[in-house]
Amino acid sequence: SNGGKEIVLTGVNIGDFGKSTGETFIDLIRALDKVEGIVRYRISSIEPNLITDEAIDFVACSRRFAPHFHIPLQSGSDEVLKLMRRRYDTTLFRHKIEKIKEVMPHAFIGVDVIVGTRGETDTCFEEARTFIESLDISQLHVFSYSERPGTQALKIDHVVDPKTKHARSQQLLDISDRKLHAFYEAHIGQKANVLFEQTRKGGMMHGFTENYIKVEIPYDHSLVNETRQVILEGWNCLLYTSPSPRDTR
């Protein structure tokens, strides 16, 4: 009712939607895709075991769902994933990434990882780092493990010291920087539709492409909450395809 054009689906285990009603996540996104007036939906933070191949195929063909996924991995070591009691392993995770890229080669995939968990030995971390490096993803969200009273993790003997946590975090952040740079570079010169936001900073405004590339231009109030086609010119820069931004509504 306020004129919003993009909705992000988020929550705790959104892939479990409908368990109490007999509905499924694919039922939800199919219904949302039919709602008029919404330009884009994004799927945020859905676990790999809960995003089905059917849902991935649907997003690839959808009129409104963006080719943008945020998928928690937490660790690229199967041993650590077992300690975390995750409902997936690295084999399943790799399959989901490869499936997304098969049907949406330009999809943006953000991945959550945690470093320094109890039980993450040097060997486990190296396995995780190697696995993450091998994935065709766009960006990592790296978090350092912190102790919480009363959790089962406190029963695990191996503790990672703060200095090692920081070093491991930095290694993964370096990987993230390289992957994001490569993802952006691959799109330079391409046309894209950008939905511009209201935020104004230093005389500039920004928006995002369907596959979550952030672009920046001089502030123009008439473009707020509007979608325009642009040519991606460089890092956070763009060149309009005509003297005036092209309306893609």
Regions found by a protein language model. Name each.
Residues 1-16, 69, 91-102, 126, ...:
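Proteins enriched for Cys/Gly/acidic motifs involved in redox and nucleic-acid/cofactor modification
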Residues 71, 112, 132, 140, ...:
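Hydrophobic, well-ordered secondary-structure elements that form the walls
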Residues 155-242:
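Terminal RNA-binding accessory module
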Residues 2-125:
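Conserved SAM/AdoMet-binding glycine-rich loop
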Residues 18-37, 84-87, 147-178:
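Radical SAM enzyme [4Fe-4S]-AdoMet core and its adjacent flexible, acidic
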Residues 243-249:
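A short, hydrophobic C-terminal helix/tail in secreted or cell-surface proteins
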